[in-house]
Amino acid sequence: MNIEEFTSGLAEKGISLSPRQLEQFELYYDMLVEWNEKINLTSITEKKEVYLKHFYDSITAAFYVDFNQVNTICDVGAGAGFPSLPIKICFPHLHVTIVDSLNKRITFLEKLSEALQLENTTFCHDRAETFGQRKDVRESYDIVTARAVARLSVLSELCLPLVKKNGLFVALKAASAEEELNAGKKAITTLGGELENIHSFKLPIEESDRNIMVIRKIKNTPKKYPRKPGTPNKSPIEG
């Protein structure tokens, strides 16, 4: 996906990028490739691939969720900043918090945010299980996002405790959504969520399957969740 395809593809979905925003994506790409030589951020480094599989793919969440109507986002296990930072570039009013367990990645994200002059971005070096028990952040975000970091039953335990009541947990997944959803139903219900929608589509150009799961927080998460670090992965809430 070249820059023209990227720009026109987003414009078709009602997202118009200014010259400044396009510059931010260019700098994001340059820094991603530069830092990737020092720390492992991504296996995808070819420019057209990054624009399609990282930038465009991240922004697809905004095709189905109206980010103009929310203020706060938390991104769990964002790695090199996906999906939240491409979304932040498109919707500059957002207050974005990223939680990642690897300090090197947090350092990259801080430097990146500074270079892109992104305001209202917070980067936390923490495990999602620990972060989700913090009283100052628990059940405080309009939207919590995660992109392919773990299966849905595990992700729900890491993300739903952070979503405020009536807010959304938005999971960006490749294929196998139905299978994951069946295994994750018990976790979603236990943690106070309810599936609102699954949006299935194909990424342009390469035609690979994508799914965006939108889960509404309808009641408070029981205090015992998330459990201690490692437990959600070892013993997921599955029926």
Swiss-Prot record:
UniProt-annotated binding residues for S-adenosyl-L-methionine: 77, 82, 128-129, 147
Keyword entries, A-Z: Cytoplasm, Methyltransferase, rRNA processing, S-adenosyl-L-methionine, Transferase
Gene disruption: observed consequences: Low-level streptomycin resistance.
Primary localization: cytoplasm
Enzyme class, spelled out: transferase
Keyword S-adenosyl-L-methionine in annotation: yes
Region spans: Disordered: 219-239
GO molecular function terms listed in the Swiss-Prot or TrEMBL record: rRNA (guanine-N7-)-methyltransferase activity
Domain of life: Bacteria
Subcellular location(s) of the protein: Cytoplasm
A Pfam family recorded for this sequence: GidB
Cross-referenced HAMAP family: 16SrRNA_methyltr_G
Record function comment: Specifically methylates the N7 position of guanine in position 535 of 16S rRNA.
Family: Belongs to the methyltransferase superfamily. RNA methyltransferase RsmG family.
PANTHER family, alphabetized: S-ADENOSYL-L-METHIONINE-DEPENDENT METHYLTRANSFERASES SUPERFAMILY PROTEIN
Name by which UniProt lists this protein: Ribosomal RNA small subunit methyltransferase G
